[in-house]
């Protein structure tokens, strides 16, 4: 066997259908689009159109609203905090707050504060100062010998 003798497996490649290349090709002239009409023109698909059936976006009712005053917290898991401590990006001996998490690259932006969740394990004894935390997260932090200070009651 030589490199110039290597072929694809049978059925691995398929010849593409060349549309609009003369009537002898079998898919010339209208190129499989039928005759005239909206769907024969370029930009064929009509988004959300279901053939005259009432489309789903009109069948389903409107619901809810966007609260412009809603607080948006950045979620951080205990596992991410532990990984940052292990990588020596976070100093566990100092108080860890939103600014420290941002400097360590754990979060990108602070938004309305940081909320800590209990995903992952925490072995380091850390002192956290965050906007909120879940109850299991608080338990895990205290079990590891750390402490947590909540800055706002809204994120609980």
From Swiss-Prot:
<dbReference type="GO" id="GO:0022625">
    <property type="term" value="C:cytosolic large ribosomal subunit"/>
</dbReference>
<feature type="compositionally biased region" description="Basic and acidic residues">
    <location>
        <begin position="1"/>
        <end position="13"/>
    </location>
</feature>
<keyword id="KW-0689">Ribosomal protein</keyword>
<dbReference type="InterPro" id="IPR021131">
    <property type="entry name" value="Ribosomal_uL15/eL18"/>
</dbReference>
<dbReference type="GO" id="GO:0003735">
    <property type="term" value="F:structural constituent of ribosome"/>
</dbReference>
<feature type="compositionally biased region" description="Gly residues">
    <location>
        <begin position="21"/>
        <end position="35"/>
    </location>
</feature>
<dbReference type="InterPro" id="IPR005749">
    <property type="entry name" value="Ribosomal_uL15_bac-type"/>
</dbReference>
<dbReference type="InterPro" id="IPR036227">
    <property type="entry name" value="Ribosomal_uL15/eL18_sf"/>
</dbReference>
<dbReference type="InterPro" id="IPR001196">
    <property type="entry name" value="Ribosomal_uL15_CS"/>
</dbReference>
<comment type="function">
    <text>Binds to the 23S rRNA.</text>
</comment>
<keyword id="KW-0699">rRNA-binding</keyword>
<protein>
    <recommendedName>
        <fullName>Large ribosomal subunit protein uL15</fullName>
    </recommendedName>
</protein>
<keyword id="KW-0687">Ribonucleoprotein</keyword>
<dbReference type="GO" id="GO:0019843">
    <property type="term" value="F:rRNA binding"/>
</dbReference>
<keyword id="KW-0694">RNA-binding</keyword>
<dbReference type="InterPro" id="IPR030878">
    <property type="entry name" value="Ribosomal_uL15"/>
</dbReference>
<feature type="region of interest" description="Disordered">
    <location>
        <begin position="1"/>
        <end position="41"/>
    </location>
</feature>
<comment type="subunit">
    <text>Part of the 50S ribosomal subunit.</text>
</comment>
<dbReference type="GO" id="GO:0006412">
    <property type="term" value="P:translation"/>
</dbReference>
<comment type="similarity">
    <text>Belongs to the universal ribosomal protein uL15 family.</text>
</comment>
<dbReference type="Pfam" id="PF00828">
    <property type="entry name" value="Ribosomal_L27A"/>
</dbReference>
